[in-house]
Regions:
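Acyl-donor (CoA/ACP) binding surface of acyl/acetyltransferases
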Residues: 1-38, 72-159
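Hydrophobic residues in alpha-helical segments
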Residues: 32, 41, 63-65
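Conserved GNAT-fold acetyl-CoA-binding loop/helix
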Residues: 36-58
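Secondary-structure boundary/capping residues
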Residues: 37, 46, 65-68, 134
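Alpha-helix initiation/capping motif
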Residues: 45-48, 64, 93, 138
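Short structured motifs
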Residues: 58-59, 86
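A short helix-loop-beta-strand connector motif used in the catalytic cores of GNAT acetyltransferases and
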Residues: 59-74
Length: 159
């Protein structure tokens, strides 16, 4: 299996998707420390900025290398340089099947940023990584994520 790689930066109509760096840790920690963001995304709130830095420097990189996942992206509104969310492939089920995940700072909910970012990553992954299928999982109580899945055309396989 060849190494899964995507461009370091992608622009959409309203967003810049770019690989996250340690310089983004403070912006990322602002929303990953919030229970309303972390628990629906499947992780406990990130307690400290140091924990966020460790995640970016070690855990994320090691997971991506181990599972041969592309780097994923921070979501940035054009005209700013502030990471307000993320869109990633967080799990490889098979060589040609990845699972997508996303987070977003609550101040930006309801603006269509996650569907825009996720659609871009999905389209790119099918063309550049030759995927067969992309999966998305969310908790039953996470109605916002369910709406994103519907907007992206995902099909419910289990409830």
């Amino acid at each position: 299996m060849t190494r899964a790689e995507l461009p370091e930066r992608i622009e959409t109509e309203r967003l810049v998707l770019r690989v996250r760096t340690i310089a983004d840790a403070e912006d990322i920690h602002v929303y990953t420390s919030l229970p309303e963001v972390s628990y629906p995304a499947g992780f406990p709130p990130v307690k400290t900025l140091e924990d966020e830095i460790y995640y970016l420097e070690h855990i994320l990189l090691e997971r991506n290398q181990k599972d041969n996942l592309p780097a994923g992206y921070g979501i940035v509104v054009k005209g700013t340089d502030k990471v307000i969310g993320s869109v990633d492939f967080n799990h490889r089920h098979e060589d040609d099947v990845l699972e997508i995940g996303y987070t977003l700072h609550p101040d930006y909910w309801g603006r269509g940023y996650v569907p825009e970012a996720a659609r871009t990553l999905i389209d790119l992954a099918f063309t550049e990584l030759n995927l067969h299928k992309i999966e998305l999982s969310c908790f039953g109580y996470n109605l916002q994520s369910q709406r994103v899945a519907e907007k992206l055309g995902f099909t419910l396989e289990a409830a």
